[in-house]
Amino acid sequence: TLGTVTNVEGNFTLMAPENSTLVASFIGYTPVEIPLKGKKIVVFKLVPDAQSLEEVVVVGFGTQKKASVVGAVQSIKPAELRVPSSNLSTSFAGRIAGVISMQRTGEPGADGANFWIRGAATFSGTTDPLIFIDGVEVSAGDMNAIPSEAIENFSILKDASATALYGARGANGVILITTRTGKDLEKARINVRIDNTFTAPTRTLKLADAVTAMKLRNEAILTRNPDGTPAFSDDKIQGTLEGRNQYVYPNVDWFDYMFKDYSMNQSANLNVMGGTKKVDYFISASINNDNGMLKKDPNNTFDNNIQNLRYSFQSNVGAWLTSSTKVNVRINSQIVNYNGPSTSMDNLYKYVMEAPSMYFAPVYPNINREDHTIFGNKSGGPIGSGGFSIYRNPYASMVQGSSKQSAYTINTAFELEQKLDFLTKGLNFKALVSFKNWSKTTVNRSFSPYFYELQNPQEQEDGSYLYDYNSISKGRTALETSTSTTGDRLMNLQATLNYQRMFGDKHDVGAMLVYLQREYNLNNPDNNYYNTLPERNQGLAGRVTYAYDGRYLAEFNFGYNGSENFEKGSRYGFFPSLAVGYLISNEKFFEPLTKVISNLKIRASYGLVGNADIGSNRFPYLTKVDLGGAGFVFGDQWQTSSNGATITTYGAEKVTWEIGKKYNVGFDLGLFNKLSLNVDFFREDRKDIFLRRNTIPAESGITGDLRPYGNLGKVRNQGVDMSLDYNHAVSKDFM
């Protein structure tokens, strides 16, 4: 097979045998084949492929034509998600209207962004959106591990009409990701990407040096009391200014001593896709190596810097068993190996901010040939008890141990698609079963630092100093080891019956019914009895759509969901939504304007959403009793106490669903088939938010965690989303 590409004017040159057949193809156009038969010049005329040009948007449990969408749904091209980062969520900021994204840390392994769809509409439980990849619920960590090269479609569902199918669990918005397949390819395609990136802080705080800090401290003391005694002598300040000796007159820049200016990270992705009329496949393998910015201690046998090494694998295989039956098998797995200091990066940064720069050096020379590192410190600091206290040495905290973590994730899904045209045209059935298992093992090893205080410094004739040390905190050279394991399992079951049919030339009717079931378990539950029980959710959802002549659009959605968090009689909630749209640009009277205004659609929606998440407090309607209570005294037997049952939390029998009313009005405007503007005005009124009751008098003895929950809170969340896009192929005729 030979191939070539045209220039910007459409001309091409290709050396080919005389009996060859030339094939010309372009995205959005129907391929054309012309037998060569000895011809020297061949002219191709491609015609638009109406089906390819009809853009499709991924919505809840299916797809819709973009022109028919009446909900607040935004799609983003996978290419726009490609950023020099190992986490997909870091690409959201500034690219998706209505999504608030915040990266709280750049620490490898923890640098995924927190994000909210249209802000936070509740202050109980989670505010995170629901995330689905290929119809399977996943965590934000699973989403972050998906390389952008593996993504086919990426959609954000914002309003009630778009999220109602997910019921209570979609109250905070939904993210839908579809991975790639090879179904449109006859020949295998191999793609390789290798990146090397630099990471550096955008800004660091500039702390005062030792001389400035000492002068300011003395100034503060004398300002309060002119007769007061300065904290630092003139000799101390002058010796530090002149840099006479780094141990006697320390001037430590803890940031520079512990952190590098930048780090280098590597990533690579290899994917293969292809297929035939019977079988299609997509296989992707990725590796990401992210490094921290800590400097290595040459005295340690281990590297205390952070390294987060992640391996990701994605496999999608589909096969047509018959002309109407297809099965899809999808497997996603991740292996994450983390190595870093035993002290968290948050604490290390905090310690650097708090550490004095003038009292002690990070380490002292081992003049007495001790069998351990001589870490600097000074008595009289803020840490300690019983009349003895020292300061924090952040360098000792950084190098005193290491933490190794190994995490394994496996997501598997089996899907069956069955066309039911033999019953009625446009009817099909889909069943999906998925299973996820995640486990994590952590091993921490650390020693206890030996801290010394420099004393009796004596300057010699040659300007050098003699001094000795006083041990102020004895440590331990032997490594102490601790381990922990955690993990969870998630199983989902979905059954979808979908109907889509055009009646005549003007009536486009669609309907869908979905059954959902979910079970979540902890692999290593603690002693809390509730954590040993599986979390189960069940629901029924439906959608009905109607479009008349491609101009008048209507959609009704509902979710009927059950939650174990409420008592019988209150466990199920019904959450409907209604949306309408008017595609003005498809009207006949609008035809003279279509060369300028290529698209104009107005839409509106209203619906209810529910929330049953009360954080970690399960079964709030039950009164929780601890049978291990002690210290009970009865009658005049005040010298004798007894054991017995203790109420830890009073139940709230009437607690029920948190309800939100969502309103959305928007319009889509297209100009010259190049410029598109999408604007949405939204408001959500959330009521019956879960809160502990604070109005119970303390004299009743019901205080703290004893207080029951109630549907008490209210939140109003409103704003505007806007996105502006310009798409045009660059050529000599740019405009």
Model-identified regions with their sequence ranges:
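Extracellular/periplasmic, surface-exposed regions of secreted and cell-surface proteins
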Residues: 127-128, 262, 316-324, 330-335, ...
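Short, small/polar-rich motifs associated with maturation and membrane association
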Residues: 1-314, 326-327, 386
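Active-site-proximal polar cores
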Residues: 451
